[in-house]
């Protein structure tokens, strides 16, 4: 650790760590509240919605992939996926060339649920979105969080960022389709 100690002081390290911790906690609290309000009408919790979202964008993802990208333990991903299967939103499968891993895919009902939730996004207040509008007005776009992504890449690895980018590209590509589909009556 001699090299690390030469690059920064203990004071700098502690101030940085505490700053990140406090800002992350404050932001997460707002994100969590917004997310819970958005999905409440669908009787889902955040883990369940996240699994549906990941399954939608990473078609045929393994439980391990869902856990990794969902930043949850494999048993958490499996148990919540099981609940979603019982509700008819997910189906489990094994692959002939990979019997060790369990894969999840959305059912038609799961896909329809994701589409409906996306259509109803603006039916609830989103404090994080509202809090970012001044930056969008000033710079013409929402923040990219490139420095945060660099830190996440160093913590979780390139695979995590690749999955993140791939899923968001799929979301961008499919957004028009989501808007065109009829709303499901629940």
From Swiss-Prot:
The keyword Repressor applies. InterPro entries: HTH_MarR-typ, HTH_tscrpt_reg_Hpr, MarR/SlyA-like, Tscrpt_reg_MarR-type_CS, WH-like_DNA-bd_sf, WH_DNA-bd_sf. GO terms for molecular function: DNA binding; DNA-binding transcription factor activity. One of its GO terms (biological process) is negative regulation of DNA-templated transcription. Pfam families: MarR. Keywords: DNA-binding, Repressor, Sporulation, Transcription, Transcription regulation. Residues 63-86 bind DNA. Signal peptide: none annotated. The keyword Transcription regulation applies. Homodimer. HAMAP family: HTH_type_Hpr. Negative regulator of protease production and sporulation. NCBIfam families: PRK13777.1 (NF010349). This is HTH-type transcriptional regulator Hpr. It comes from Lysinibacillus sphaericus (strain C3-41).
């Amino acid at each position: 650790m001699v090299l690390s100690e030469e690059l920064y002081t203990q004071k700098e390290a502690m101030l940085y760590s505490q700053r990140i911790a406090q800002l992350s906690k404050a932001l997460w609290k707002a994100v969590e509240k917004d997310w819970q309000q958005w999905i409440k009408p669908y009787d889902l919790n955040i883990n369940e919605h996240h699994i549906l979202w990941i399954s939608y964008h990473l078609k045929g993802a393994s439980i391990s992939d869902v856990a990794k990208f969902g930043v949850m333990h494999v048993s958490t991903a499996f148990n919540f996926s099981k609940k979603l299967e019982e509700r008819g939103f997910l189906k489990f499968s094994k692959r002939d060339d990979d019997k060790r891993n369990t894969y999840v895919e959305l059912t038609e009902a799961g896909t329809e649920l994701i589409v409906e939730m996306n259509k109803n996004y603006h039916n609830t207040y989103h404090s994080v979105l509202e809090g970012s509008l001044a930056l969008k007005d000033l710079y013409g776009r929402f923040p990219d969080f490139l420095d945060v992504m660099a830190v996440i890449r160093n913590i979780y690895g390139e695979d995590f960022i690749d999955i993140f980018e791939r899923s968001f590209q799929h979301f961008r590509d499919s957004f028009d389709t989501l808007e065109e589909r009829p709303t499901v009556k629940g």
